[in-house]
Amino acid sequence: MKFNLLDHGYASLIESWGSDQSIIEAARMSTNKGFLGWGEDPCPACNGTGWDPIPETTSDKECRYCKGQLKTVGDEKLLAYLYKNKHSTPFEMAGMTIEVKAPIFVFREWHRHRTQSYNEMSARYVPLPDENYVPTVERLMSGANTATTNKQAQNNGKELNNNAAIMWLENLTMLYEHAENVYQQGIELGIPKELARLAVPVARYSRMRASANLRNWLAFLTLRRAPNAQYEIRVYAEAVGKMIADRFPRTWELFNG
């Protein structure tokens, strides 16, 4: 499962472990019951009749277990209970490892989530590809328009127009080209890669692998899918959410509920 993101990036699922079922199994270790099943089944107490014969009386009464509903709700009820009441450890029994290609400035925000494990491509050892993030004019304009509700996007009270946005992007592209020339020149001159990389902008694309349990992926999404999160990391969070929805659909439904 792979999603192409921004102009040169992607997020790809490498592996996942566990499932909605394994969350239930982990929670039920304390009672040794295990996974009982999803969906509705005939009530085991009244065998689906809705009535519970009371030995000391001659009349039947409503089943005390299913309350006359004939069926019992499956383990989705327990899953919902665990999620609602923040029983966190069962959700730590499942998780995912993903590979991400994103601008370095996105990774700097991403790495604030210290409960994930990371390993990133290093410009100390290999040259980074000459790929830099170039936002669209629409992105610049939309960011300026949200400055009143998102203080990180504030534009110092200045109104951005379309021509100014285009001019700035042209200057940005020239800056990227100059930075790459300085970077390559340094390598050709014999400057160590770990120092030549000083010329690389934070818009340069890098790659990493990130791994976390399901609980911590959901915590990541709570922050990075929020409306006030920066757009560039939000698109990656949305892709992670689609991976979770595919691998853990019942938990995902609870998270979005």
Tell where the protein language model's regions lie, with residue ranges.
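Short linker/helix segments within small regulatory modules
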Residues: 54-60
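Family-specific signature for flavin-dependent thymidylate synthase
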Residues: 1-47, 52, 66-257
